[in-house]
Amino acid sequence: MYTTYIATTPERLWQALTEPAFTERYWGVAFESDWTTGAPLVWKQGGARMSDPEQVVLVSDPYRQLAYTWHTFTEQWARAVDIAEEVRAELAVERRSTVTFDLEPQGRQVKLTVTQDFDPEGILHGMCSQGWPPILSSLKTLLETGEPLPAN
């Protein structure tokens, strides 16, 4: 679980979580979805396009909560983000995780809590525990300054 406080509105934070132009700036991922519960979710990252019937929006409560299933670990994705095939194959057999974003207004800021339910012993846990802190820091910086953190 990761929590950060962002000087923004719930509406602006929701926009940053759901609009491809935003997500691409701080995350390097663009999403295609109509963001209704049950809607498909397509990930675009590094030239790869990931789509799967199990890749869906689970909860869509605008300005309060967003949850969806994590992307499918395709060979195309692994090549696009430079993940070895052996690692991709191990990721592909882990149970599909979900990620939940809880937005809670607190005065002139929003408390954002991100929870991802994965196997704590799995490879994905290690990868995401290194990935979420810089993603959320860049999101916060983008919303507060207009520019994301520089990419590594």
Predicted regions located by residue number:
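Generic structural detector for well-ordered beta-strands
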Residues: 3-7, 42, 56, 102
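Hydrophobic pocket/interface hotspot
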Residues: 13, 23, 41, 57, ...
